[in-house]
Amino acid sequence: MEKVFERLMYASRWIMAPIYLGLSLILFALGVKFFQEIFHLLPNIFKIGEVDLVLLTLSLIDITLVGGLIVMVMFSGYENFVSQLDVGEDNDKLSWLGKMDAGSLKNKVAASIVAISSIHLLKVFMNAENISNDKIMWYLLIHITFVLSAFAMGYLDKITRTGK
């Protein structure tokens, strides 16, 4: 009975596979949104102000960072928790594929969240005249929380890896 239970529990990791595949649909949606923003910009390129162009650029960078985060979580999560990816050894293989454990993934996700939060905070500051001070304060506090959390996770990971 115990053996059956253990095999069933081990096989249940495959439940995550469609979830990782679902992330690719979100990645596709982000790509559509990215190019939708580009296509909205092109006809108005000479009408748009500098601040609005910078805000749009920051939004596109934000979408790009989120897309990279999705790719990282999708591939590393699949490799760490479901099965190894067999993509061959050609030049198209990502250099970090198969080298990122769950701890490294956690730290990279935290760093990505801080980067995304930084871009969002920069967008808030660029549009500060239209945002109340208390909302700006909350954005800043949330960002600081992300930064401190990422730092703490990295520090704890360093402590556990070195055994100090």
From Swiss-Prot:
Record keyword Nucleotidyltransferase present: no
Chief site of localization: membrane
Keywords: Cell membrane, Membrane, Transmembrane, Transmembrane helix
Transmembrane segments: 15-35, 53-73, 109-129, 136-156
Bilayer disposition of the protein: Multi-pass membrane protein
Localization, UniProt: Cell membrane
InterPro entries linked: UPF0114, UPF0114_bac
Cellular component GO terms, alphabetical: plasma membrane
Family listed: Belongs to the UPF0114 family.
HAMAP family given in the database record: UPF0114
Protein name from the UniProt record: UPF0114 protein Sbal_0780
Native species: Shewanella baltica (strain OS155 / ATCC BAA-1091)
